[in-house]
Amino acid sequence: MNWQIIFTEQYTRKAAKFIKIHPDLENQYVKTLQLLEVNPHHASLRLHALKGKLDGLYSVSINLKYRITLTMIITEKEIVLVNVGDHSQVY
């Protein structure tokens, strides 16, 4: 069973801005979301819990430089996307 990815209005605006600035990453971004929907624990996503001010959030990698932060509601198999950007922007 696939996970349900929830795109908030705020995240959708951030993602559109991210793709506008980095059109070369659009395919990688889409592939990351597709893999996240099928298996958020896939090794290539490098899913990990965040600490400090982002405690309660998780992060997955688009590539070595760019990340998506998210919340995971494991019991309902929902993933709520929070932010997208480079390491310094999302952390």
Task: Show which residues each predicted segment covers.
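Short alpha-helical linear motifs
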Residues: 31, 52-55, 70-74
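Generic detector of bulky aromatic hydrophobic side chains
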Residues: 30, 38, 47, 87-88
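Enriched for short, Lys/Arg-rich terminal
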Residues: 2-4, 13-26, 62-91
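PIN/NYN-family metal-dependent endoribonuclease catalytic core
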Residues: 7-8
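A short, surface-exposed loop/turn module that caps and links secondary-structure elements
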Residues: 35-60
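A structural signal for well-ordered alpha-helical scaffolds and beta->alpha junctions
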Residues: 26-30, 43
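Short, flexible segments with low predicted structural confidence
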Residues: 1, 21-22, 33, 41
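A ubiquitous structural signal for well-ordered alpha-helices
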Residues: 14, 31-32
